[in-house]
């Protein structure tokens, strides 16, 4: 009589380590960012003649979103920021990498870097404490003539540069998007 041999593998069960409040908050912020990028991509894809892609993880020096319209010879590199605070910062290196990307695509006549901001409908006022507010979105066109600096967008849609601790208002144009948004042209 033949016997069937089988092997048994014994694995040690790993119990997930409890996450600290800081780790939970970081994970939530990252998820909000990915969701906002994904929303932008889906909106472009539903629009005629547009194609859009999320380009990768934060560890890779790529813009968050690349959107192209070959019919209109247009390309956007988009840096997306989302949050519950009253301001959303954009580091200078992220603006610079978006500019580097659009400069490589000579075939497109219209090449723009967009800073896409989404202020969620809940405002964080303390750890785990939120207050309802209006959801707002802003799509600002980076002016290539400006010096590249860290900048911040406020809930009312104003953009400020931050250099050596000095805050200076930047007057960036709002981009009229080819899809429906929660954009506000004035607060």
Model-identified regions with their sequence ranges:
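Domain-level recognition of nuclease-like catalytic cores that cleave nucleotide substrates
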Residues: 6, 27-32, 112-187
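Short acidic/glycine-enriched loop/turn segments that link adjacent beta-strands
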Residues: 59-62
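Short, charged, amphipathic alpha-helix that recurs within catalytic cores of restriction-modification
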Residues: 86-115
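Conserved catalytic cores of phosphodiester-cleaving nucleases, focusing on short active-site segments
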Residues: 44, 65-67, 74-84
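Acidic-basic catalytic patches of nuclease active cores, encompassing PD-(D/E)XK
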Residues: 2-56
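Short, solvent-exposed loop/turn segments that connect beta-strands within catalytic domains
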Residues: 70-74, 107-110, 123-125
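Acidic-residue sensor for enzyme active/binding pockets
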Residues: 37, 79, 94
């Amino acid at each position: 009589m033949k016997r069937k041999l089988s092997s048994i593998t014994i694995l040690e069960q790993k119990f997930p380590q409890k996450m600290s409040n800081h780790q939970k908050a970081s994970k939530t912020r990252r998820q909000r960012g990915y969701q906002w990028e994904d929303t932008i991509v889906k909106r472009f894809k539903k629009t005629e003649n547009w194609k859009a892609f999320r380009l990768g993880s934060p560890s890779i020096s790529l813009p968050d979103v690349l959107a192209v319209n070959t019919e209109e010879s247009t390309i956007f590199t988009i840096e997306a920021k989302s949050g519950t605070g009253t301001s959303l910062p954009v580091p200078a290196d992220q603006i610079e990498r978006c500019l580097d990307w659009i400069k490589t695509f000579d075939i497109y006549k219209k090449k723009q870097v967009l800073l896409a901001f989404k202020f969620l409908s809940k405002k964080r006022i303390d750890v785990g404490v939120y207050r309802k507010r209006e959801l707002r979105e802003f799509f600002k066109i980076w002016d290539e003539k400006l010096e590249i600096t860290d900048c911040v967008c406020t809930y009312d849609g104003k953009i400020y540069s931050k250099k050596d601790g000095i805050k200076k208002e930047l007057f960036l144009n709002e981009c009229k998007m080819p899809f429906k948004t929660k954009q506000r042209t004035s607060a």
